[in-house]
């Protein structure tokens, strides 16, 4: 999510002798009284209006030294780094003529697609209307126009071929003005999905709106077909403005239910009618039972890599397949299958990592757990067992950005041993022994401790985007020397706007409790005084593979609560959270709802021992998985919490999606893990809400965590005759957007102020 550095090693009172504290003060308070008198606290209106939001700059790379970007006046501009020249390739007038909100340049630079009429569907998916603009004659392409609305559209990597998905079928155009060639014919709404994922694959496996992939030179097009014919359907009412509500139906496999059947096909787009789509075989050890397809990576035009998972998700198989021209088929020999298995949890982190192939087109780099249980980069040439470990240590490699002939760029949380930081590293792989350099560790060190990067072709240039803890900044760098070339975005307006704001202080610390490390971020009022007592709000997510304690910049609702309302807010990363090794990550395997809750409670007790927390005014709140954890913490019977809020909580793992739930819990069957499914519900603890103030919130059109979850909590509380508060948002999904957002945060603020006896 979201400077001077000070290390404090404290020896505390006898009550906390077991507590080791390491502290970074991220936002020191201003000390000049004359300045303080002219400064104001944050207001809720500031947050709801997005007054202090920041900008980032990610170049839209189109070559090794060129990128596109949209200027402040909405012209599409091409910038050449080496010449320093820029020119407008598409005017704002052309964009405005079709109300375009997005664009895409064809690789041959002859055409641009313009996207308008954006209509959101689920988390990543949306439909839109597309227009093709011919840059050579300055006119829109007429004749054989694209149908509308389109579910997905993309250019081939070379030339100006187009592939698009319309009404769940895939179409191909050799040129934008040509008639389309229909590749699939069996697409049906909510039944068969071609080239786009169904709900569960979009949300829980692919994390994209598309399921088709061009080969590097555009010869082949691979795509997934998802068959949801036998999947149970979730149905909910959408009230709208009509006399009768309409019913939304989504094929949605819950834990233990039948899953979509997935198949992968590849078609030669040069002569698509000649042979037609060819199916890629599934590895035998995967195909013998229920399985998932997890990703596809093209290696060359005639070599492709597919990744598969068993339904249990502790075994992943990477399969490298080659095109056999004589048979016009794809061959996936067993000798090119690489197996990744976890014996202590699930395979990978949240997802199984994807390979980054080297220039020999057979060996690759991949992140997976080493023998010490930390996720690191490995080089695989023949088998996973013979993999060469590239990085090592009690920290984790996060992402491989780019591999060139002589360098590998990646991110990790190694520097100074803070798991909530991200720095960019370069390893020289063209020399022996390989040398490692941290590109970002000492760049604007006080301001920037959390980076990501975007690379041009061959890593000739790259952009760094720093997310904090100071105000975010985006910069352009030479990929050979790492020298900074220019600042792309430094958020000067935001910096000036914050000069007269009393921001809260932020500290990142860690607790060592019973051989478990609990990192936490504490947000303190601007005039914080350790001799005083403050109300405490715990903000929790706590889901497997998540991380809340990060060195990022944010001015948000909890910033306001600290700045204006004088609350202390804490975020704690307990067992099950990511980037601190498998021991912590896999501790929650097959027992969700236990250690995540225990660790929040443990942290609260340690906070009380620090002496500045009013133990009679402690609250907890969370959203989604965080709503589940906050509910269980409130119902723990500890007496620690006076009140709490759950927004769109899961209430029983039998109600949630199969792909996500079974990854961490196994199956809800008697011979697997049904007992813990039953024991981990919020409803089973209804009686324990009697001594807390509980606010339950949900959107009625939540496609992700269904309203069913909160309805069952409410029913259990009513049956137990427990008083509680509830707020629902009609026709709102999991994100509670638009005017609902303002209402939500205003309502939650009133609830907390009433709980803590704070005046309006």
UniProtKB/Swiss-Prot annotation:
- InterPro entries under this entry? AB_hydrolase_fold, Pept_S9_AS, Peptidase_S9_cat, Peptidase_S9B_N, Serine_Prot_S9B/DPPIV
The residues that hold substrate are 203-204
The EC number(s) given in the record are 3.4.21.26, 3.4.14.5, 3.4.21.-
List the residues marked with site Cleavage.
23-24
Kindly state which reaction or reactions the protein catalyses: Hydrolysis of Pro-|-Xaa >> Ala-|-Xaa in oligopeptides; Release of an N-terminal dipeptide, Xaa-Yaa-|-Zaa-, from a polypeptide, preferentially when Yaa is Pro, provided Zaa is neither Pro nor hydroxyproline
Temperature notes read:
Optimum temperature is 37 degrees Celsius for gelatinase activity. Temperatures above 50 degrees Celsius inhibit gelatinase activity.
Going by the UniProt record, its keywords in alphabetical order are:
Angiogenesis, Apoptosis, Cell adhesion, Cell junction, Cell membrane, Cell projection, Cleavage on pair of basic residues, Cytoplasm, Disulfide bond, Glycoprotein, Hydrolase, Membrane, Protease, Secreted, Serine protease, Signal-anchor, Transmembrane, Transmembrane helix
Q: Which residues lie on this side of the membrane: Cytoplasmic?
A: 1-4
* Top class in the EC scheme: hydrolase
Cysteines engaged in disulfide bonds, as pairs: 321-332, 438-441, 448-466, 643-755
State how changing residue 657 to Q affects the protein, per the record.
Answer: Inhibits endopeptidase activity. No change in dipeptidyl peptidase activity
Could you tell me which PANTHER family the record lists for this protein? PROLYL ENDOPEPTIDASE FAP, PROTEASE FAMILY S9B,C DIPEPTIDYL-PEPTIDASE IV-RELATED
> How is the quaternary structure described?
Homodimer; homodimerization is required for activity of both plasma membrane and soluble forms. The monomer is inactive. Heterodimer with DPP4. Interacts with PLAUR; the interaction occurs at the cell surface of invadopodia membranes. Interacts with ITGB1. Interacts with ITGA3. Associates with integrin alpha-3/beta-1; the association occurs in a collagen-dependent manner at the cell surface of invadopodia membranes.
What is the designated name of this protein?
A: Prolyl endopeptidase FAP
């Amino acid at each position: 999510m979201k400077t001077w550095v000070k290390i404090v090693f404290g020896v505390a009172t006898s009550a906390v002798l077991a507590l080791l504290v390491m502290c970074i003060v991220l936002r020191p308070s201003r000390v000049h009284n004359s300045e303080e008198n002219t400064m104001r606290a944050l207001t809720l209106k500031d947050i709801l209006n997005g007054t202090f939001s920041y900008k980032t700059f990610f170049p839209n790379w189109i070559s090794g030294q060129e990128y596109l970007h949209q200027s402040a006046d909405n012209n599409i501009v091409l910038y050449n780094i080496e010449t320093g020249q820029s020119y407008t390739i598409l005017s704002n007038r052309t964009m405005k003529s079709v109300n375009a909100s997005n664009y895409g340049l064809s690789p041959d630079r002859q055409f641009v697609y313009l996207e308008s009429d954006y209509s959101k569907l689920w988390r990543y998916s949306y439909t839109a209307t597309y227009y093709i603009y011919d840059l050579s004659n300055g006119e829109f392409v007429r004749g054989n126009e694209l149908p509308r609305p389109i579910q997905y559209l993309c250019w081939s990597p070379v030339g100006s071929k187009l592939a698009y998905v319309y009404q769940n079928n895939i179409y191909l155009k050799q040129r934008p003005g040509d008639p389309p060639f229909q590749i699939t014919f069996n697409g049906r709404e909510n039944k068969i999905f071609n080239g786009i994922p169904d709900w569960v694959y979009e949300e829980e496996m692919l994390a994209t709106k598309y399921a088709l992939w061009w080969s590097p030179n555009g010869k082949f097009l691979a795509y997934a077909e998802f068959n949801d014919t036998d999947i149970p359907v979730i149905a909910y009412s959408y009230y709208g403005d009509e006399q009768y509500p309409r019913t939304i139906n989504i094929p949605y496999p819950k834990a233990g239910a039948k899953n979509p059947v997935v198949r992968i096909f590849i078609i030669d787009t040069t002569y698509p009618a000649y042979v037609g789509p060819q199916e890629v075989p599934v590895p035998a050890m995967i195909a013998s039972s229920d399985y998932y397809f997890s990703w596809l990576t093209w290696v060359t035009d005639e070599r492709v890599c597919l990744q598969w998972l068993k339904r249990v998700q502790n075994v992943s198989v990477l399969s490298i397949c080659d095109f056999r021209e004589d048979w016009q088929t794809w061959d996936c020999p067993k000798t090119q299958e690489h197996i990744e298995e976890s014996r202590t949890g699930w395979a990978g982190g949240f997802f199984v990592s994807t390979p980054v192939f080297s220039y020999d087109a057979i060996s690759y780099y991949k992140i997976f757990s080493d023998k010490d249980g930390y996720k690191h980069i490995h080089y695989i040439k023949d088998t996973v067992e013979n993999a060469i470990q590239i990085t090592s240590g009690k920290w984790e490699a996060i992402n491989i950005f780019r591999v060139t002939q002589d360098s590998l760029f990646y991110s990790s949380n190694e520097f100074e041993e803070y798991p909530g930081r991200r720095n960019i590293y370069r390893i020289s792989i063209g020399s022996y022994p390989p040398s490692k350099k941290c590109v970002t560790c000492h760049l604007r060190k006080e301001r920037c401790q959390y980076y990501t990067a975007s690379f041009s072709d061959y890593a000739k240039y790259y952009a760094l985007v720093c997310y904090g803890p100071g105000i975010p900044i985006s910069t352009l760098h030479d990929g050979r020397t790492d020298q900074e070339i220019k600042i792309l975005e430094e958020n000067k307006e935001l910096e000036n706007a914050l000069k007269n704001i009393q921001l809260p202080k932020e500290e990142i610390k860690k607790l060592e409790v019973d051989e478990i490390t609990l990192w936490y971020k504490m947000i303190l009022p601007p005039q914080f005084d350790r001799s005083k007592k403050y109300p405490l709000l715990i903000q929790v997510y706590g889901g497997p593979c998540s991380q809340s304690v990060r060195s990022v910049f944010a001015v948000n609702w909890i910033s306001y609560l600290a700045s204006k309302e004088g609350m202390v807010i804490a975020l704690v990363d307990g067992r099950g959270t990511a980037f601190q090794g498998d021991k912590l990550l896999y501790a929650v395997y097959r027992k969700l709802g236990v250690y995540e809750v225990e660790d929040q409670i443990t942290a609260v007790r340690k906070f009380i021992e620090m002496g500045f927390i009013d133990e009679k005014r402690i609250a907890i709140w969370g959203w989604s998985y965080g709503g589940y954890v906050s509910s269980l913490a409130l119902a723990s019977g500890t007496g620690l919490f006076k009140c709490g809020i759950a927004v769109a909580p899961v209430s029983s793992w039998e109600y949630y999606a199969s792909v996500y739930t079974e990854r961490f819990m196994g199956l809800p069957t008697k011979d697997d893990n049904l007992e813990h499914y039953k024991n981990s519900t919020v409803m089973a603890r209804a009686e324990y809400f009697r001594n807390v103030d509980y606010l339950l919130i949900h959107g009625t059109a939540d496609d992700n965590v269904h309203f069913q979850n909160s309805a069952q909590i409410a029913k259990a509380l009513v049956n137990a005759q427990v008083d509680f508060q509830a707020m629902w948002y009609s026709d709102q999904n999991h994100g509670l957007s638009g005017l609902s957002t303002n209402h939500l945060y205003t309502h939650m603020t009133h609830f907390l102020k009433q709980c803590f006896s704070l005046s309006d």
